[in-house]
Structures are given as structure tokens and as C-alpha cells.
Amino acid sequence: MSKILNTIWQYVRAFVLIYACLYAGIFIASLLPVTIPGSIIGMLILFVLLALQILPAQWVNPGCYLLIRYMALLFVPIGVGVMQYFDLLRAQFGPVVVSCAISTLVVFLVVSWSSQLVHGERKVVGQKGSKE
């Protein structure tokens, strides 16, 4: 019985922490003069808490594993919502495709530039440069 209660406690604690970060993000987003989704701010809060090890990762693991396991099911309402606006999407198909293609190209360029910046050639300390 105590093992069942312990498992239930772990799931409850995980979801309370995840939702606390979500609602903190929503509250902060309502105070900001710019429009940033509260869920994004909430994820950043959760990330900072985990990265600084203020919040132990094992406290949110059960809830995260459960959400990831059923992630495909969570996208069904979004798909239904998109299908409600199918006529609008069909009318704007060209601009949507061009926008996606350009944004993908921009992401490729930014990632390649930043990767080159981070992982580019560096001099090895103590090694003389070769003259060719």
C-alpha cells in the first residue's frame, strides 16, 4: 500500500511542479508589455530551476515521462482545430509554404553559423602554426 501511495505522491508532485511553472509563466506573461506565451515563459522557468539544480530532476521525471508517452494523443485537438480552418489554410497555402521554407532556410543558416563559431578551428596551445 505504501508503494502505491509513494507512486501517486511522485506523480502528484511532478504535475504540481509542472503546473506551478506553467501558471507562474502565465502570470509573468500577463504583466509583460510584449506578447509572449505564458507556456513558453513557464518552460523557461522550469528549465532554469532544473539547470540551476534548485529543483531536482527526479521530482518532475514521472510527470514528464507520462506526458511524453502520450504526446501524440495531445496533438489531436490541435489537428482538429487546424481542420476547422482548412478553407483558410487552402486559400493561404502559397504564403504558408513560402514562409515555412524561408524560416527553415534561416534556421539552417543560423545553426550552421553558430556551430562554426562554437566548433570552428582553434589553435592548440603550444603548437606552432605551419607555414604553407
From Swiss-Prot:
Disulphides: none
Keyword Nucleotide-binding: no
Domain of life where this protein originates: Bacteria
Keywords: Cell inner membrane, Cell membrane, Membrane, Transmembrane, Transmembrane helix
Stretches that traverse the bilayer: 8-28, 31-51, 63-83, 93-113
Broad class of where this protein is predominantly found: membrane
Subcellular location: Cell inner membrane
Membrane topology: Multi-pass membrane protein
InterPro entries documented for this protein: LrgA/CidA, Uncharacterised_UPF0299
One Gene Ontology term, aspect cellular component: plasma membrane
Record-stated family: Belongs to the UPF0299 family.
Cross-referenced HAMAP family: UPF0299
The protein's name: UPF0299 membrane protein YohJ
Source organism: Escherichia fergusonii (strain ATCC 35469 / DSM 13698 / CCUG 18766 / IAM 14443 / JCM 21226 / LMG 7866 / NBRC 102419 / NCTC 12128 / CDC 0568-73)
Gene coding for it: yohJ
